[in-house]
A protein has these predicted regions:
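N-terminal small/polar loop signature for handling phosphorylated ligands or for N-terminal nucleophile
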Residues: 1-39, 117-152
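Short, surface-exposed connector motifs at secondary-structure boundaries
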Residues: 2, 96-104, 166-172, 190
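Conserved beta-strand elements of the Class I
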Residues: 27, 103-105, 132-134, 174, ...
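Structural motif
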Residues: 32, 107-111, 175-178
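Gly/Ser/Thr-enriched, mixed-charge loops and adjacent short helices
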Residues: 36-131, 148
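Glycine-rich phosphate-binding loop plus the immediately following alpha-helix
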Residues: 47-70, 158-190
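Phosphate-binding and adjacent anionic-ligand microenvironments
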Residues: 139-141, 146-151, 155, 165-322
């Protein structure tokens, strides 16, 4: 198409999202290798691409426009590796007073991600030889924790804790459409609101959520979340377990099932039993609730159960499938 290409180099997905957002790009492509190669399309703000953008890209490929593009239309690839330094500065800004007196260890299956995480904590004055274990997801977008007592705290509860303190400070949050429903109840308690952006919106119904999310990049960046979590521990002088006591106990279980009919048909039949969402339906049950979302392709249905314990959430999924 003759578009200019900016190359961010070898980065985590979270770094790529930062680069797309910081540089105000319309679209970004994150390419991963390994046993299964993947190309992920990011839209404005480093958020999931919209359906119109996907259709536009599909049209370019279907029409073979890249084949007909003259050689003179191809621009030199711009080396944007320097954005990684700007990303590091953004990480440091998450803890303007440093992390001296705090201890935590970094862990990630991606060695580069672990090195970056540990280096960031160390430069901020954090003791990285002991303390809670901060697990960064391989793509860099999520954070989970094993506290000093050995209890594993999943990403969803860490996200809920971070959102809670945003509510306490009088701010709304923007989260993915499949984020825990418990966070909405927490927001109501403080007179705040949770805006949700879709995985692949067909229109601009989630535009406000996307606008807010562009200013809350740390909620979808595991390293930023980790740094801000440690800042919270330092500022309050409380342990992670004490902070989490303010978050309602909940657990989530996700399942994907293949249907013999269209997911849309099933959701239509369940329409009267639940509350419609922008991209699915939420069914309330005595012991929790289930979020049902159709897949973008095929006849797969994604089920997210949320309840007080993983066992109850698993039972909710089983009862629905029966």
């Amino acid at each position: 198409t003759g578009a200019r290409v900016w190359d961010f180099g070898r980065v985590l997905e979270s770094q790529m999202a930062f680069g797309v957002s910081f540089c105000s790009l319309d679209v970004g492509f994150y390419i991963t290798g390994g046993p299964k190669c993947c190309i992920k399309v990011l839209g404005e703000g480093g958020l999931p691409a919209s359906r119109p953008l996907e259709r536009e890209l599909q049209g370019h490929l279907t029409r073979g426009e890249f084949i007909r593009c003259a050689w003179s239309s191809y621009h030199d690839i711009a080396d944007m590796a320097g954005v990684r330094l700007l990303y590091q500065q953004e990480l440091y800004r998450c803890a303007p007073e440093g992390l001296s007196g705090i201890s935590a260890r970094a862990k990630c299956l991606n060695r580069e991600g672990e090195r970056l995480f540990e280096d960031t904590l160390s430069r901020l004055g954090c003791d990285v030889s002991r303390g809670a274990l901060l697990h960064l997801s391989e793509c860099g977008t999520k954070l989970s924790v094993t506290d000093e007592e050995g209890e594993f705290i999943p990403f969803e509860r860490i996200l809920a804790l971070c959102a809670l303190y945003e509510f306490k400070e009088g701010r709304d949050v923007a989260l993915p459409s499949d984020a825990p429903q418990t966070i909405d109840a927490m927001a109501e308690k403080y007179g705040r609101k949770v805006y949700r952006y879709l995985t692949c919106p067909a229109d601009k119904r989630d535009q406000e959520a996307r606008r807010i999310s562009c200013s809350q990049l740390w909620l979808r960046d595991g390293i930023m979340t980790g740094v801000r979590l440690l800042v919270l521990l330092k500022r309050t002088g409380r342990s992670l377990r004490e902070l989490l006591s303010e978050v309602p106990r909940f657990a989530t279980v996700c399942r994907a099932i293949e249907l013999v009919c269209s997911p849309g048909v099933l959701l239509g039949e369940l329409h009267g039993e639940g509350e419609p969402t922008q991209d699915g339906i939420v069914l309330s049950r005595d012991r929790g609730h289930l979020m049902l979302r159709p897949s973008k392709q095929g006849q797969m249905l994604r089920i997210i159960a949320e309840a007080a314990t993983p066992e109850i959430a698993d039972d909710l999924v089983s009862s629905l499938m029966e």
